[in-house]
Amino acid sequence: LSADSSLSLPLSGTHRYRVTHRTEYRYSDVVTSSYGRGFLTPRNSLRQRCVAHRLTIDPAPADRSTSRDGYGNISSYFHVTEPHRTLTITSDSIVDVSPPPPGLYPSGPALQPWEAARPAGLPGSLATEFTLDLNPPEITDAVREYAAPSFLPKRPLVEVLRDLASRIYTDFTYRSGSTTISTGVNEVLLAREGVCQDFARLAIACLRANGLAACYVSGYLATDPPPGKDRMIGIDATHAWASVWTPQQPGRFEWLGLDPTNDQLVDQRYIVVGRGRDYADVPPLRGIIYTNSENSVIDVSVDVVPFEGDALHA
C-alpha cells in the first residue's frame, strides 16, 4: 500500500478502517482490450484522511493514471491490452474518519430555518451549481408534492433532513436489483422501491426542488450492530447518500449528510469516496471493452473493517 502520509496511529476519537473493494468481470470470450475509469480512492477532508491506498488491476494494465476532477474526487484510469477472460480490480484503503463536531447538528446553521441554507443570493457561492436540476429533469410536480410535508415554513434545517430521511425510509422498500443506474427518480416514486442510490437521488431531488444545494455522495458504510440488532443495509457494499450545503462563518461552509436508506444523519461510520451532482459524476467503475463475448458476469465484494495498529499487510 502506498501511503499518502506517514502511517501513525489514529487520533483519539478517530475511527480507522480498512476497506477492500474487489470487482471481477468474467467474459464468455476473450477480451482484447479493456478501458476503465472509476472513483475508488477515499477523499481527504477535514474529518477524513486516506492514510494509504493501493489499486491492483489483473491483468496488469499497459497504461494507467490518476487525476483529480473538478469536484476534488480522485479518478483512476487504466487500459489493459493483454487478452483476457477475467478482469479483476481491487481497491485497498486505510482511512481515518473523525466524528462530526459536537455542535454540527444540534446548533448553528442546522437549527436555522431551512430557507437560510439556500445559496441563491450569497456572493460568490459555488454551491449554486448543486441547486440545478439534471438533464433529463428530475424535479417534477410529483417530487415537489412528495417533498412538501418535510419543508414546512421556517422549520429548522436539521428537522427537515431527519424528517425527509425518515419518510423515504418508511415509504420505500429496499429491494436489490429492482432498479438500474438509469432508473429515474420519478420511476422510483411510482414503484416505491429501489436501492441506496435511488433513495439518495430522491432526497437530492426533494432538496433541490426547494432551492437547496444538494450533492450525491458515494462511498462505504461501516456498521457494527449492537447485540440482537440487525445489520444496517449498506454493510459490505458500496453505499450512497445525500448531503446538503450550509453556509457557516463568512467564507466557510459545511455539507450535512443524510442517509435515507438507513434513516439517519451521517457520522464517523461513513467513508466518502466521491461527491458530485449525480451518480454519473462518481461511478465506482465504468469502461469499454473490445470482444466478441456475448455474456459477462460481474461480482463485487466490499469489506469494511476496523483497523488497529500501524502495520499493513497485503
Residue ranges and their predicted role:
Residues 1-145, 154:
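Linear, non-domain "peripheral" regions
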Residues 12, 189-193, 231:
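Alpha-helix N-cap/helix-initiation motif
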Residues 21-23, 91-93, 164, 242, ...:
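A structural signal for short, well-ordered beta-strand segments
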Residues 23, 179, 261:
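Ser/Thr-centric signal marking residues that sit
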Residues 38-48, 53-56, 262-292, 296-299, ...:
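Glycine-rich, small/acidic residue-mixed loop/short-helix segments
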Residues 101, 107-110, 170, 177-185, ...:
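Glycine-rich, flexible loop/turn motifs
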Residues 113-194, 202, 210, 277-279, ...:
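Secondary-structure boundary elements
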